Amino acid sequence: VLGKTESHLYRRGNFNGTFDDVINQAIMEERDTQISLSPGFRWGATLLPGQDIRVEDIFSQTAITYPAVYRNEMTGKFLKEILEDVGDNLFNPDPYYQQGGDMVRVGGMGYHFEINNKIGSRVSNMTLLKTGEKIDPVKTYIVGGWASVNEATKGPAIYDVVSNYIKREKSIIIKENRAVKIKGI
């Protein structure tokens, strides 16, 4: 047993879930980053308030072939490009260009997403949550993430990062996350 959850933990939404919030918080704290990115998977068992969080639960949320958690510098412009690209895979009006069902999960940053806009104009109002400042396209931010298919990616495995975070915190309480505002649903 790593810890206990006082919140309902799941990965079921198209833009985020509470287990995604735990994963992103773990990345930011364990890798000392301003922003975190986590792949939009909808798998793993849901945990109810009061349940123990076991190593098996972490594996069920994070078990993939490329678990290394990177820590890189990215510009605000590049962060927007990532969100726009993934968003276009989901919401391109031509179904032949739709390649996925889940948006990348983001920690430490909020943004607005307009589903019906074209690529390049869906993401706006990107904000660094810790300070409230707008994300500057030319400024560099420290970003952590995982599930990179780049073979050169170095860093600890995501299941170790999350396990260490939960062991340290002992009790997990997730507040409602409204950092991403979705329009056009």
Task: Report the location of each language-model feature.
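Catalytic centers of hydrolytic enzymes
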Residues: 1-185
